[in-house]
Amino acid sequence: MCEFCVRQADDEDDGGAAASGRPNARTARYSRNYAGPFRKTPDRLLGMGLIRLYQLTLSGFVGNSCRHIPTCSEYGYEAIARHGLWAGGWMTLFRVARCGPGGTSGLDPVPEILSDGFRWWTPRRYLSLGRKRG
């Protein structure tokens, strides 16, 4: 067991600084961006880094006016983290295109798994991911 794991187990047993009123309670960590597991390849890190740079610099000037939940930059960050730069980039591009006037609005999460029909040579299929079905 690593040193951090041993300390965490001791804190939970002793009721130390990490303890709360409930037994085995975990502190909820809120993050603006996707915090789940993903493969940290160079292309994903580059794409996620560019989106994070946008969030920290230009997003404040543009304003918080996205029509979707999660916002387009959060969607892009998660799409690239889950599906890679190529698929996530196309998904993000089409999402930003849908965000303008006359586009969709509301809850539009990133799909957890893409079906077999989404291949690298068919980027037009990513256009159908966020469309409302009538």
Swiss-Prot record:
Does the keyword field hold RNA-binding? no
Q: Which domain of life is it from?
A: Bacteria
- Which first-to-last residue range defines the signal peptide? none
Give UniProt keywords alphabetically: Cell inner membrane, Cell membrane, Membrane
- Tell me what topology the record assigns in the membrane: Peripheral membrane protein
Q: Name one GO cellular component term.
A: plasma membrane
The UniProt entry, under InterPro entries, shows: Membr_insert_effic_factor_YidD (IPR002696)
Where is it located?
Cell inner membrane
In the record, the note on similarity to other proteins reads: Belongs to the UPF0161 family.
Q: What does this protein do?
A: Could be involved in insertion of integral membrane proteins into the membrane.
Record-given protein name? Putative membrane protein insertion efficiency factor
Tell me which species this is from: Rhizobium etli (strain ATCC 51251 / DSM 11541 / JCM 21823 / NBRC 15573 / CFN 42)
